[in-house]
Amino acid sequence: MCLPTRKAEEPQIWPDTINNYPKYASSVSHVWGKRRAFSESFAAYYNSPTLPEAKYILDYQMIRGINFFEFMFWSSGSKHQGWLSQLGMKGLNEYANRATWLMQQGKPGARVAVYYPVSTIWTGKEKVAEDVKTIVNELIKNQIDFDYITDDALKETLTLKNGRLFNRSQQYYESVIIPSTLFIQKDAWHKIEEFKKQGGKILFWGDTPQLTNGRSFVNDTEPILLPDDAYYEPELKFTENVKAALPRQEIILVNEKGLIPD
């Protein structure tokens, strides 16, 4: 059995840190129609988490679409028992088991797709990856769920119907965000153009793409003609222009003052 998988380790997921990498695994599951997105958690935590901290780490991943866990631990040792033997761990296991089971019964609900610029990163322009991180942090901070899509997904998996992109989970995207990138593969760009023609919303957020590429970046490229009626936001901030390019939110969580929490 093959599952989209990520590891959750202390430098990456901990209270007061921001890292949305679980979205890589869950997006693959959603786009390709896999019921589970797997995480091996707690493998390299040199400071043993408390139960509230462990629950935070699980919740952080579940919110981002992870719905299957393996807790990495050693059941015994020569010196002392591991932290997973502490009181209350049984309850945390039961909570994780129940929550992830419920998640597996439903269908993913994100209506926004974020293009991941693999082709551009291959050329050594790694700044675009940092721009993507900034953009998705802005989305999550403003409670906008999303999935990553790639050139391969656009070419092989996503289908068009009435201005919506459907994946193999029968989930559909109404808006596609194209963050900073230089290249987009030709067939993928043609799918994006057709999505726009059918009424889908496209937001170019950051630096706009310049070229399509085929099998070569040297002699198989063509200039991209950007649509006039798409949405454009050069700043890596969540602006009203960004909001206008996105579907209406179905659920918004607010604090006691009626404001979206930071």
Region locations from a protein language model:
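Carbohydrate-binding surfaces of carbohydrate-active enzymes
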Residues: M1-D262
